[in-house]
C-alpha cells in the first residue's frame, strides 16, 4: 500500500505568512497561514483564475472587497472570486490570524471511496453506501 500523507505545524507567531502548501507538498490548491500585526494591511490584489477563501482563526479581520469593508470574526469565512480586488487589513489593537485557501479550475466533486473498517479489502464503495461507525466509547 502506497501512503501519500504530509504533516506540518501551524506557526501563529510567524511574521507575515507561512506557506503551508509547500510544507505539505500540495499541488491542487494553495493554503497559507497569515498573521497581521495591529494596524497592518496587505496589498490590494486580485487573482486571474483562483477563488480565495479566508478563515479567521484569531482576532477580527477587515476584508475590503472592491473598496467595501467587511468585518470577519473568529470562525467566519469569506470567498473572493477571480478578478475581484481585495485587501486584508487589521485596524485593531490585536493580531489577526487567517488561514487563506486558493484554488483555480473546477471542483472534482465526490471522488471519495469508503470502507467499513481498516480490515476491509477491495477498492472501496461510495461513501453513502457505507454506514457511519459507532461512536467511540467514552
Regions found by a protein language model. Give the residues of each.
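Short histidine-centered beta-strand/loop micro-motifs
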Residues: 21-23, 42-48, 89-91
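Short, conserved beta-strand element in jelly-roll/cupin
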Residues: 33-37, 46-64, 101-104
